[in-house]
Amino acid sequence: GTKLSLSDLRGKYVILDFWASWCVPCRKSHPHLIQINQKYKGENFVLLGIASDRKDEVIKKAAQEDKIDWPQMNIYEKRDQQKQLNEMYDISAIPTKILIDPEGKIVVKYVGDSAGLDRELEKIFKK
């Protein structure tokens, strides 16, 4: 697909969703992300999936099954990029959700359960 860089997303709030098709807790978190995406779409907000699967087709299939329509990036084959992202965001497990502010700073990070994302977004967008 289209090339997308995190620097392209500057000026917006971004949720990075680190996940994989084989990760059951990751997949179970998608309905919650769909609600968040619907609520804040059109605001200064973007959701980006960062998946780690052997094949892009597997990610596409999982995204279709889970009805997620935000951009997905597969970092499995891109070892350097994967290592860089894992180090930059200190990813030790998935699912991990990271909320980044318009300046590119991490607001909050959730490993596993991301229920607290709602509170953070409500504070930001007053919704």
Describe the residue ranges of each PLM region.
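A short beta-strand-turn-helix
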Residues: 1-14
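Conserved redox-active cysteine motifs that mediate thiol-disulfide chemistry
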Residues: 10-11, 18-35
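Active-site acidic short loop of glycosyltransferases
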Residues: 10-12, 42, 68, 91
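Short beta-strand segments
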Residues: 17, 47-51, 74
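Extracytoplasmic/secreted envelope proteins and their assembly/folding machinery
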Residues: 30, 34-37, 56-60, 86, ...
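Short, internal strand/loop/helix patches
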Residues: 60-103
